[in-house]
Amino acid sequence: IYEAYGLPFTRFEFDANTIRFNAGGRGWVCNMQNYLCTSGGDVTDDGRGGRGGRGSGGGAPTVLSPDGTRAVFIRDDNLWVRDVATGDEQPLTRDGIKDYGYATDNAGWRKSDRPVVLWSPDSNKIATFQQDQRGVGEMYLADTRPSHPRLETWKYPLPGDSVITVVERVVINLEDGTMVRLRMPPDQHRSSRCDDIICGGSWGDVQWSPDSSSMAFLSTSRDHKQEWLRIADISSGEVHTVLEESVPTFF
């Protein structure tokens, strides 16, 4: 039993129904409906933003489902899911390759191993993307140190480049293992709030409907002059643009 001002953790994650934290060397998920807590995996934020934590799967950061029963992580450029209770792991995608992987959190100047996903409210579907950086130009940085310097390389498209980073939006259904690609051209690796698809540590501009049957998202032009609000039917992949806005300067 712990006092309110002496809790055994300094960080925690939460959503509308659960709170997740580490205590006693284990990860805990507490259901706020019945106030029951179960242990399973290390779920504390790894300090690089967002709601991801580190679980099994080779120590890769994971993102828990809203009901706390499953966690997804990246392995070899593909997205995997782990059962929190049993530890069983299964691949959700199989065709991811270097520079064309799933749920990739890599803007070049900023990157992490945490998957970029958004769970549906019913915990049965995942919105994510396959990020295409094949053929994109590279930037280099020499990391100086007392011993030999280390050369760091990352993808960095420059103004005027014809080959740039894009994302192909997909939805994965965990109930039957199917994946639906949204029927639209690839989106720019942008958001309405910054030059990265991740802003403030979370994947913004994407929202599920309460019944998990559709989702809304924003598409942003590379120059931040145009925005498109779109609705996707996740069973068919059909996408409808419901609002378009443009400005002479930038958003």
Task: Tell me the role of every PLM-derived stretch.
Residues 1-251:
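Beta-propeller folds
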